[in-house]
Amino acid sequence: MKKIGVLALQGAVDEHIQMIKSAGALPSKVKHPSDLNELDGLVLPGGESTTMRKIMKRYDLIEPVRAFAKEGKAIFGTCAGLVLLSKEIEGGEESLGLIDTTAVRNGFGRQKESFEAELNVEIFSDAPFEAVFIRAPYLIEPSPEVSVLATFEDKIVAAKEANILVTAFHPELTNDNRFMRFFIEKMV
């Protein structure tokens, strides 16, 4: 059984753990660099990206997560995870630089502008995906290596490059585990 870690510093950790279980893998909480050992994949959940980056620095997780990706292991980032994984963050904040695109933090507005929307997702032909956007970012300026998987209002909200998958929305806050299944079955 594949073992998938969830960066457990803040955000929807428990929801991701349930989603990983529903997709047939074994979840594990990651709080320290040694927790990355023996993992097949890693999830960076939503939350507040600046706070997450500061906590990652405090626990010396920045370079170990980069090394995890450079080993070819898969990482799935949702919302703040998307922001952290992007090569650049509009406004110049530090990122992990693991997917060649730029993130626009809170691109769809603040908390009161949170919403749900049906998305047609490139990798799911069976039915639209009901996405939950909370202070959601979006992506701009993807390199040719980045596959755009979904857009909303002409803004990139899901993408993939090599072993990195990102969504601007929160699949873990729905009952639809297709993104997690795709991550575990096709990328890990």
UniProtKB/Swiss-Prot annotation:
This is Pyridoxal 5'-phosphate synthase subunit PdxT. The active site is at C79, H170, E172. Its EC number is 4.3.3.6, 3.5.1.2. PANTHER family: PYRIDOXAL 5'-PHOSPHATE SYNTHASE SUBUNIT SNO, PYRIDOXAL 5'-PHOSPHATE SYNTHASE SUBUNIT SNO1-RELATED. It catalyses: aldehydo-D-ribose 5-phosphate + D-glyceraldehyde 3-phosphate + L-glutamine = pyridoxal 5'-phosphate + L-glutamate + phosphate + 3 H2O + H(+); L-glutamine + H2O = L-glutamate + NH4(+). Pathway: Cofactor biosynthesis; pyridoxal 5'-phosphate biosynthesis. It comes from Listeria welshimeri serovar 6b (strain ATCC 35897 / DSM 20650 / CCUG 15529 / CIP 8149 / NCTC 11857 / SLCC 5334 / V8). Pfam families: SNO. InterPro entries: Class_I_gatase-like, PdxT/SNO, PdxT/SNO_CS. L-glutamine binds at G47, E48, S49, R105, I134, R135. GO terms for molecular function: glutaminase activity; pyridoxal 5'-phosphate synthase (glutamine hydrolysing) activity. Signal peptide: none annotated. HAMAP family: PdxT. It comes from the Bacteria. The lineage of its organism: Bacteria, Bacillati, Bacillota, Bacilli, Bacillales. Catalyzes the hydrolysis of glutamine to glutamate and ammonia as part of the biosynthesis of pyridoxal 5'-phosphate. The resulting ammonia molecule is channeled to the active site of PdxS.
